[in-house]
């Protein structure tokens, strides 16, 4: 392993904002991870494990060690009824989805082009167009930072929720995802009830769904390689049936979907209807085609993004009485932070 000192983080996160890390190292094996996390030499140093850095914003320089997960490898087994994959945590997610489609393995096509690594998918319980990671998860393996051993959780033990999992709670800063196990029924059925997939026929092929999802994402979402961003910046808020009924009276065209504990309202619709598409502070801008995405127009600072996010949150609350929660992770000087904490520090 080679440790970089004073490393520029711009190439390591998709927002592409200039920030520095005191140390940065690329981990290519579980032994690398054990050496970094479990040895006395680096035990006291704050650490942040990242994959593609596709769902985070460094709010300032990071004083600890950034560990880049580059564990690679895909193992494929099958029986009469199922395909089973064991995927190393550093595998690129869009490439994994593409590989599955090429192999005729259905189940991930709705999750095409979501940036990031396989190891990040269970942490966020990534989802799109009616499918979430939990729907295809068999197990998740992780390095336990307390014991230095690799452990396995079943899908049920991962406690998946909307953009949520055990890795954000009981196992927060106690685990590094090393691999995921995925399970796909050979009797594949397309999930095409959402958005632009609705007009696909029920007998469509895996490739048809994949192509439609890719085309939609490329049309609506900016390529981080061209214009820095972290994808969907805010979560879709879940409100009670009563609150939704009141909202629907004033806004009959509100975009929403049933949720387990109420109604999930489209955050992009709320931001758009608040007149914020194209709204800009410094080099940070609400994307003109997809209001849920904040982009770096080229010279944005973290301060620009934070100020814009806070402004969006306040304006949406003023319009609808709904408080948006950011989906993007905010990384502070030595630990994870959030928008409320940042705003209180500015006061």
UniProtKB/Swiss-Prot annotation:
<dbReference type="InterPro" id="IPR016169">
    <property type="entry name" value="FAD-bd_PCMH_sub2"/>
</dbReference>
<dbReference type="InterPro" id="IPR011601">
    <property type="entry name" value="MurB_C"/>
</dbReference>
<dbReference type="GO" id="GO:0051301">
    <property type="term" value="P:cell division"/>
</dbReference>
<dbReference type="InterPro" id="IPR036318">
    <property type="entry name" value="FAD-bd_PCMH-like_sf"/>
</dbReference>
<keyword id="KW-0560">Oxidoreductase</keyword>
<keyword id="KW-0573">Peptidoglycan synthesis</keyword>
<dbReference type="Pfam" id="PF01565">
    <property type="entry name" value="FAD_binding_4"/>
</dbReference>
<dbReference type="GO" id="GO:0008360">
    <property type="term" value="P:regulation of cell shape"/>
</dbReference>
<feature type="active site" description="Proton donor">
    <location>
        <position position="232"/>
    </location>
</feature>
<dbReference type="InterPro" id="IPR016166">
    <property type="entry name" value="FAD-bd_PCMH"/>
</dbReference>
<feature type="active site">
    <location>
        <position position="163"/>
    </location>
</feature>
<dbReference type="GO" id="GO:0071555">
    <property type="term" value="P:cell wall organization"/>
</dbReference>
<feature type="active site">
    <location>
        <position position="327"/>
    </location>
</feature>
<keyword id="KW-0132">Cell division</keyword>
<dbReference type="GO" id="GO:0071949">
    <property type="term" value="F:FAD binding"/>
</dbReference>
<dbReference type="InterPro" id="IPR003170">
    <property type="entry name" value="MurB"/>
</dbReference>
<dbReference type="InterPro" id="IPR016167">
    <property type="entry name" value="FAD-bd_PCMH_sub1"/>
</dbReference>
<keyword id="KW-0963">Cytoplasm</keyword>
<dbReference type="GO" id="GO:0008762">
    <property type="term" value="F:UDP-N-acetylmuramate dehydrogenase activity"/>
</dbReference>
<protein>
    <recommendedName>
        <fullName>UDP-N-acetylenolpyruvoylglucosamine reductase</fullName>
        <ecNumber>1.3.1.98</ecNumber>
    </recommendedName>
</protein>
<comment type="function">
    <text>Cell wall formation.</text>
</comment>
<keyword id="KW-0274">FAD</keyword>
<keyword id="KW-0961">Cell wall biogenesis/degradation</keyword>
<keyword id="KW-0285">Flavoprotein</keyword>
<dbReference type="GO" id="GO:0009252">
    <property type="term" value="P:peptidoglycan biosynthetic process"/>
</dbReference>
<dbReference type="InterPro" id="IPR006094">
    <property type="entry name" value="Oxid_FAD_bind_N"/>
</dbReference>
<feature type="domain" description="FAD-binding PCMH-type">
    <location>
        <begin position="17"/>
        <end position="187"/>
    </location>
</feature>
<keyword id="KW-0133">Cell shape</keyword>
<dbReference type="Pfam" id="PF02873">
    <property type="entry name" value="MurB_C"/>
</dbReference>
<keyword id="KW-0131">Cell cycle</keyword>
<comment type="pathway">
    <text>Cell wall biogenesis; peptidoglycan biosynthesis.</text>
</comment>
<dbReference type="GO" id="GO:0005829">
    <property type="term" value="C:cytosol"/>
</dbReference>
<keyword id="KW-0521">NADP</keyword>
<dbReference type="InterPro" id="IPR036635">
    <property type="entry name" value="MurB_C_sf"/>
</dbReference>
<comment type="similarity">
    <text>Belongs to the MurB family.</text>
</comment>
């Amino acid at each position: 392993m080679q440790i970089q000192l004073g490393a520029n983080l711009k190439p390591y996160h998709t927002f592409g904002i200039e920030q520095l890390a005191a140390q940065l190292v690329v981990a290519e094996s579980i032994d690398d991870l054990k050496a970094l996390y479990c040895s006395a030499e680096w035990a006291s140093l704050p650490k942040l494990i990242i994959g593609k850095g596709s769902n985070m914003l460094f709010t300032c320089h990071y004083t600890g060690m950034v560990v880049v997960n580059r564990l690679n490898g895909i193992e494929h087994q099958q029986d009469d009824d199922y395909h089973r994959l064991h995927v190393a945590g550093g595998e690129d997610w869009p490439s994994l989805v593409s590989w599955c489609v090429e192999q005729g393995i259905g189940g991930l096509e709705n999750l095409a082009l979501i940036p990031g690594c396989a190891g990040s998918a269970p942490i966020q319980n990534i989802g799109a167009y009616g499918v979430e990671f939990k729907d295809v998860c068999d197990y998740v393996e992780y390095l336990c930072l307390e014991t230095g051993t690799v452990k396995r959780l079943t899908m049920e033990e991962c406690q998946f929720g909307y953009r949520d999992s055990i890795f954000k709670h009981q196992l927060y800063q106690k685990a590094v995802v090393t691999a995921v196990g995925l399970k796909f029924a050979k009797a594949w059925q397309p999930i095409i009830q959402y958005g632009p997939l609705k007009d696909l026929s029920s007998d469509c092929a895996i490739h048809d769904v994949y192509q439609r999802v890719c085309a939609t994402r490329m049309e609506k979402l900016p390529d981080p390689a061209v214009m820095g961003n972290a994808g969907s910046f805010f979560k879709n808020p879940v409100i009670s049936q009563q609150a939704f009924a009141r909202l629907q009276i004033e806004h009959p065209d509100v975009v929403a979907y049933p949720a387990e504990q109420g109604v999930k309202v489209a955050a992009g619709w709320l931001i758009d209807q608040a007149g914020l598409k194209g709204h800009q502070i410094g080099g940070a801008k609400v994307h003109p085609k997809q209001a849920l995405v904040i982009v770096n127009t080229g010279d944005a600072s973290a301060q620009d993004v934070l100020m814009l996010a806070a402004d969006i949150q306040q304006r949406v609350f003023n319009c609808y009485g709904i408080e948006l929660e950011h989906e993007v992770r905010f990384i502070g000087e030595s630990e994870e932070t959030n928008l409320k904490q940042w705003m209180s520090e500015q006061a």
